[in-house]
Amino acid sequence: MDSPAAAGRPTGRVVLVGAGPGSVDLLTLKAARLLAQADWVVHDALVQPEVLALATRAVLIGVGKRAGRRSTPQAEIDRTLVDCARAGGLVVRLKGGDPLVFARAREELDALRAAGIPVEVVPGITTAQAAHAALAVPMTERGRRRAVVLATPQVHAREPEHPAAGGSDLQWARALVNAGGGAVYMAATAVGRLRAALLSLGLPAGTPATWVANVSLPGQAVVATTLGALAPLPPALAGQPAILLLGTAAATPAPVPSWDKVGDRARAVGHAAIEH
């Protein structure tokens, strides 16, 4: 594996970088700088083209993982990162949201360290935070919400918690019930199981449940309901990335900002900072 930008260089380094929830305007300045400097960018399927466009000198390698679609095996992603680093230069492993939140970071960090590859992590705005911001609903409130729960009902078949292994996959549900709600990642393909588990553990059927799809993007959509009436996303949003907020009442969501139209002045300031 050879890269013109990395020719003749010693073994490179890998940086796990958070791409944020979607909009390029929610990317951190450090993430943008690293993309501009990168020789290789190994990116998730949901990373937006506007974000990838910042990697002007890099070889782009897509390693998508999306429900219901062909996914790149984790072992293959690990090998790709090691191979790119050994070819030399800067490798950016670009992950949607924050690289340490439901992003398989542990496997990649372990593989890189085992191979003797220097690695670091740059945080990003996680989808739960961006979704609450879009609704102008605080994630914590004095006297009301003292805990933040980020959960997922997705359990790998090889994990001991999986029912097929004789375990229970309700740890995530108990955490949500104990906190009275939270943010649920990758919930769209597990609606029935999620609803049944939470109701069986005592979360009230009237608990507000809000889907936020395409968070921070022009096609952002909000579907407000309750846990008892929770249903899959409507057909128009089927297959779109979405997060479920439980216990978050948003009967009248705040106006959704048009992240693609934040203004040339803001973009110019950001690009000037990146260049320096």
Identify the residue ranges that each predicted region occupies:
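Class I SAM-dependent methyltransferase SAM-binding "motif I" and its flanking Rossmann-like core
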Residues: S3, G96-A179, A221-T225
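A contiguous loop/helix-start segment that scaffolds small-molecule binding in enzyme catalytic cores
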Residues: D2-P4, P10-V14, R86-V91, R104, ...
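Short hydrophobic/aromatic-enriched beta-strand-loop microsegments
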Residues: V59-K65, P118-E120, M139-R146, G202-W211
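Residue-level signal for well-ordered alpha-helical positions
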Residues: L54, A134-L135, A197
